[in-house]
């Protein structure tokens, strides 16, 4: 398949150089092919069990993230993940304190401290649940686009997705938040996962990448108009 793609690329390049006005068209095609070829060379093809919903969703999420970070050169922001890790770290701190205190002051002497740590741990777990449900939601990427002039705040791009259990419909949502106006716009698509994986379970980036780019470009065009 790689050889065939290379053969097609050489053939298309020859046609562009010989025909009038063909240069720009072939150049654009080569740009996209170059990006996809780079992924195929640098990374092993993503191959998963098509019947494993979590693996399917994770592979699609990771590839969508790769498009925004590598093709559009956005910078990932780890604030959401850091918030979750902070809550988990505090929860673990209470568990460790309870363990050490009970070792140094055997039960029942340690009872008040153990009770406090247990209550605190479950409170933190409740906070974590609220955080993941209402703050993180299904967002798996927050990326910043730096203003070229350095005058305006960064634009923010967010990726979120969903794939229901026993369902083949994958939904990818891209959210744009203007750094200057704080206005938020969204675009999404819902497609069958069969469109993006071949019969062996290998992710076909040639079919998936254009869908992501189309989402991005629709929001980027609106941003330029406004």
UniProtKB/Swiss-Prot annotation:
Its main location: endoplasmic reticulum. Keywords: Acetylation, Endoplasmic reticulum, Membrane, Transmembrane, Transmembrane helix. Residues 108-111 are lumenal. Signal peptide: none annotated. It is a multi-pass membrane protein. The keyword Membrane applies. Residues 2-86, 133-226 are cytoplasmic. It is found in: Endoplasmic reticulum membrane. Pfam families: SPC25. InterPro entries: Spc2/SPCS2. GO terms for cellular component: endoplasmic reticulum membrane; signal peptidase complex. The modification N6-acetyllysine is found at residues 169, 191. Residues 9-32 have a biased composition (Gly residues). GO terms for biological process: protein targeting to ER; signal peptide processing. The modification N-acetylalanine is found at residue 2. Residues 1-37 are annotated as: Disordered. The chain crosses the membrane at residues 87-107, 112-132. The keyword Zinc does not apply. Component of the signal peptidase complex (SPC) which catalyzes the cleavage of N-terminal signal sequences from nascent proteins as they are translocated into the lumen of the endoplasmic reticulum. Enhances the enzymatic activity of SPC and facilitates the interactions between different components of the translocation site. Component of the signal peptidase complex paralog A (SPC-A) composed of a catalytic subunit SEC11A and three accessory subunits SPCS1, SPCS2 and SPCS3. Component of the signal peptidase complex paralog C (SPC-C) composed of a catalytic subunit SEC11C and three accessory subunits SPCS1, SPCS2 and SPCS3. Within the complex, interacts with SEC11A or SEC11C and SPCS1. The complex induces a local thinning of the ER membrane which is used to measure the length of the signal peptide (SP) h-region of protein substrates. Belongs to the SPCS2 family. This is Signal peptidase complex subunit 2.
């Amino acid at each position: 398949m790689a050889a065939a793609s290379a053969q097609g690329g050489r053939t298309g390049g020859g046609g562009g150089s010989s025909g009038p006005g063909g240069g720009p068209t072939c150049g654009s095609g080569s740009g996209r092919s170059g990006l996809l070829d780079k992924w195929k060379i640098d990374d092993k093809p993503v191959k998963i069990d098509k019947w494993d919903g979590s693996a399917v969703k994770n592979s699609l999420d990771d590839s969508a993230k790769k498009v925004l970070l590598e093709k559009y050169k956005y910078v990932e922001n780890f604030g959401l993940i850091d918030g979750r890790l902070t809550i988990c770290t505090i929860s673990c701190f209470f568990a460790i304190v309870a363990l050490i205190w009970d070792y140094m002051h055997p039960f029942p002497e340690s009872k008040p401290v153990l009770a406090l740590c247990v209550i605190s741990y479950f409170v933190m777990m409740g906070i974590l649940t609220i955080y993941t449900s209402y703050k993180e939601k299904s967002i798996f990427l927050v990326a910043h686009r730096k203003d070229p002039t350095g005058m305006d705040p960064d634009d923010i791009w967010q990726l979120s997705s969903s794939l229901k259990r026993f369902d083949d419909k994958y939904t990818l949502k891209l959210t744009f938040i203007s750094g200057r106006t704080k206005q938020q716009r969204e675009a999404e698509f819902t497609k069958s996962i069969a469109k993006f994986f071949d019969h062996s379970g290998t992710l076909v980036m040639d079919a998936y990448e254009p869908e992501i780019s189309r989402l991005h470009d629709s929001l980027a065009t609106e941003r330029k108009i406004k």
